[in-house]
Amino acid sequence: MRSGCVVVHVWILAGLWLAVAGRPLAFSDAGPHVHYGWGDPIRLRHLYTSGPHGLSSCFLRIRADGVVDCARGQSAHSLLEIKAVALRTVAIKGVHSVRYLCMGADGKMQGLLQYSEEDCAFEEEIRPDGYNVYRSEKHRLPVSLSSAKQRQLYKNRGFLPLSHFLPMLPMVPEEPEDLRGHLESDMFSSPLETDSMDPFGLVTGLEAVRSPSFEK
């Protein structure tokens, strides 16, 4: 009888061990790879950077013409796809411009339609302050929004202004272009009703946007 109880206890312990092994626990201090979404195949982020003492703060933007510059706030062209292409190496692509962030021989950033492993892949390093540095293995320079004059001034110093980036989630979900245009045209084509509870016609304009559940 006693041996039977021992066998039952063994089976129970084995079952508990398998259950725990099959479901890894999530710890609150799991590490930066969890908080920064490094486990995701593609991260949608805005890359925020700022100069000394918080001056010249902006978001990296890849425009449709391939120009890479600063956006004062989050915009459609500052929304980026960050995708791992190798160990600790990523490719960065503009969601709306459909251009890859790439670096020229002089360290100038540009957006290219064709991905190049040499010019458009960057080593991703997370710093203790939470900011990321993206460095080109080929050119041995960090991604930076600094000007040509600044790059020359800081040459061989191991640091460039506007080269530390904070990955940020989009603050406002994007609306479909056709819906946003429709609402804006309706909103600004009608005169304001100053004595109305809805002077801008927001409620009226949104009545056309109905949940699929209402159609049941």
Swiss-Prot record:
SUPFAM superfamilies: Cytokine. InterPro entries: FGF15/19/21, Fibroblast_GF_fam, IL1/FGF. Expressed in fetal brain, cartilage, retina, and adult gall bladder. Induction: Induced by the bile acids receptor NR1H4 that binds and activates a NR1H4-responsive element within intron 2. It is found in: Secreted. Residues 1-24 form the signal peptide. Involved in the suppression of bile acid biosynthesis through down-regulation of CYP7A1 expression, following positive regulation of the JNK and ERK1/2 cascades. Stimulates glucose uptake in adipocytes. Activity requires the presence of KLB and FGFR4. Interacts with FGFR1, FGFR2, FGFR3 and FGFR4. Affinity between fibroblast growth factors (FGFs) and their receptors is increased by KL, KLB and heparan sulfate glycosaminoglycans that function as coreceptors. Interacts with KL; this interaction is direct. Interacts with KLB; this interaction is direct. Interacts with FGFR4 in the presence of heparin, KL or KLB. Interacts with MALRD1. This is Fibroblast growth factor 19. It comes from Homo sapiens (Human). The lineage of its organism: Eukaryota, Metazoa, Chordata, Craniata, Vertebrata.
